[in-house]
Amino acid sequence: MMNSKIKKRLRGYIFSRPFMEERVPQHVQNIVIRDYCSKKDIQYLLSATEYAMENSALMLRQLVKDLPSMDGIVAYSIFQMPEDDDERQSIFNSILSSNKEIHFAVEGLSLNDNDSFNHIESIWQVKKTLPNCNFL
């Protein structure tokens, strides 16, 4: 008997520049995303690559505009989202208000409701605060 469940269709989102002091080759980002989608039974649509200009989120914004043609986005990491809180939260709110979702392959997380929004924002705030902590 065939499974008639329709797979979610998510567009990949990768970086061509370092993010949060990390640098991951594009082909590795795509491998991680493809593996994540395979394990979650998600149809992976080829990745869009963010522009190399510092702080650019032009491709991410374009993906959000294109959401009506897919079920969501799968990014390599939550730390590829804009560092600016207002910009990041605006993008997340646009995704939620479209009844779509965004997944983060490395962290194994997805944003699809207010609880997941708050959880991901908490992770962001910890990551941004850690460099200012003196552990000695």
Residue ranges of each PLM-predicted region?
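Short, structured surface patches at the beginning of a domain
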Residues: 1-136
